[in-house]
Design a protein with these regions (language model features):
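C-terminal catalytic "cap/lid" subdomain
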Residues: 1-225
Length: 225
């Protein structure tokens, strides 16, 4: 999530957190994993909260899309600094900042050993980053979607607000929808369900967790059909 990039800051990008993410991604990249990344923009601007303050929703969402491009460029630079090749693809044309996204370009880059960062959401307003990442995951025929957040999985209720909340290790999409759990927004959840794309929700802020998920350790929550 874009918000995770804030680290200890109130806003923007925490360079230490960015470097930690880059190192974790490098670690699994060196294991031969093909990686496509979609990152949010909540650390810079959220279209929906902008709309609540009187912004036109479409313009607000476009600002949010641009925020994801800023984060993608930052992550790309951090990855290159660790010696990993990274490519930013954008859902709207903005060469030379990034290349225009296509499924074939993304797959080609990943097969050539590059980490692909897919930015600017779906290129359309009214779609969240969750929906953007679900769409891209389905398009590039990913084996699994990893949703790195600030929480260590899916709970029966918000663990920050409800001390009795318990964590699911494993849950079906039907159960998520029935319980109204906020894993992702409804559109994204339904897309993953319909296209049989499993998700692992885990805490990305704990160093080493990404490698554990890839190694098959049971951390976070697996969502599947």
């Amino acid at each position: 999530s874009g918000e995770s990039l804030m680290g200890e800051k109130q806003y923007g990008i925490d360079e230490k957190r960015l470097a930690e993410y880059a190192e974790q991604i490098k670690e699994i990249h060196q294991q031969g994993v093909q990686i496509g990344i979609v990152i949010g923009g909540g650390n810079i601007f959220r279209g929906l909260s902008g709309a609540n303050k009187g912004f036109d929703r479409v313009k607000g969402d476009q600002m949010g899309m641009l925020a994801t491009v800023i984060n993608s460029l930052a992550l790309s630079s951090a990855l290159v600094a660790t010696g990993i090749k990274a490519r930013v693809l954008t859902a709207v044309r903005m060469e030379p900042i990034g290349e225009f996204y296509s499924k074939w370009k993304a797959i080609e880059c990943m097969e050539n050993g590059e980490v692909v960062i897919m930015s600017a959401g779906t290129g359309n307003p009214f779609f969240t980053t969750d929906t953007g990442s679900s769409l891209r995951g389905i398009e590039i025929e990913a084996d699994v979607m990893l949703k790195g957040t600030r929480v260590d999985g899916i709970y029966t209720a918000d663990p920050e607000k409800d001390p009795t909340a318990t964590k699911f290790d494993d849950i079906t999409y039907d159960e998520v929808l029935k319980r109204g759990l906020k894993v992702m927004d409804l559109t994204a959840t339904c897309m993953c369900k319909e296209n049989n794309l499993p998700i692992v929700v885990f805490d990305m802020d704990t160093v080493g967790n990404l490698k554990k998920v890839i190694s098959g350790e049971e951390i976070g929550t697996l969502v599947h059909n």
